[in-house]
Amino acid sequence: IRGPDIKFQKDDALQAIKIDLPASYFKDTNYENLIINPRKANFGGFLNYDYFYSKDDYSTDLNAYSEIGIFKDYWMLNNSVLYRDSPDEGEKQFLRVSSLFELEFPDKYLKLRVGDTTSVYNSLFNSFRYGGISFGTNYTDRPDFVYWNMPALQGSATLPSTVDLYINGVNLYKQSITPGNYSLQTGATIDQAGDAKIVVEDILGNQTVRSFPIYISSQLLRVGLNEYDFSLGKLRYNYDEDDSDYRDFFSKVYFRRGVATSTTLGFDATYSEKVSNLSLLWTQGVSKFALLDTAYAVSDFNGDVGYAISASLSRNFGNWSFGLNTRYYTEEFQQLGFDEYDFNTKMSNL
């Protein structure tokens, strides 16, 4: 065995030669969490229903809401209807509330939606209802998949060792490792902020400790991971009164990417013949103290250009959370999905 980084030591008492090999001579080990794709569902169906009845001296009301669905493998089709015994003027007695077909691609964490659904929300734009097509990532339905900024514990060991992760003095993760370079995924159960400490202890009792501030939040994507949604269709208005009120055609692209452990950047762009919006999104973990979420937007409504900005500062303490939010809109700013005569509040603070 030869090499500039290999050390030899003669032990006369034991009549042995001790050989010290660096971790690079051992096989690298990646201790990833086991992720199992959901099993295909057998053919089946479901029925959800809700009834409301009221009676007074002047009127009697009976309303019923029902959702009927069928599913198989990774797809599902559902339809919801509303019945009013005594509809008001302009309302239908039988109303189709929504019809939606969903197809999952579990190995890619993707979902296709065709039918009535809602748009992706951001801190400046409210969601709106539409009928059309949506295709994008679907992380939240998979509890075994860590999509946020969990710390990946990476390093090397020349002896069998144990790696411990402490946050605010509490041991949250423990893993035994073999000699060599290692990479550990700490799992999906941690969502905290504070002082993190990684302790590596080998079988001889030698310890190495690394400390650093950390803010873990589901709003911060894992480094290199993309979150996106592409949608197009027609805006839906008065869905609780008319089941066919589809109007302006639109297209929308929503995209976010984890560029660093504490930084996620993205944009949200929508286009229609009357209104176009573009917003830039920035989510930042401020050391171990708080989460800063900002958005900057511009709109074009029939040639009138408007601007908007929002900023929120929040902190999760485990059992409770604290947050501040402020928004500012110019008079010309218009959102897709709003009626022409709807106006934004110039400034709001929460």
Where are these regions (language model features)?
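Outer-membrane beta-barrel channel domains
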Residues: I1-N226, L235, S279-L350
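A generic structural signal for short coil/turn motifs at secondary-structure boundaries
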Residues: P87-E89, Y239-D242, G266-F267
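Compositionally biased low-complexity segments at domain edges in trafficked proteins
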Residues: V223-F255
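Alpha-helix capping and helix-loop boundary segments enriched in small/acidic/polar residues
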Residues: D242-Y246, T270, F301
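Short catalytic-loop micro-motif centered on adjacent basic/acidic residues
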Residues: T264-A269, D293-A295
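Feature captures the catalytic cores and cofactor-binding loops of soluble hydro-lyases/lyases
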Residues: V275-N277
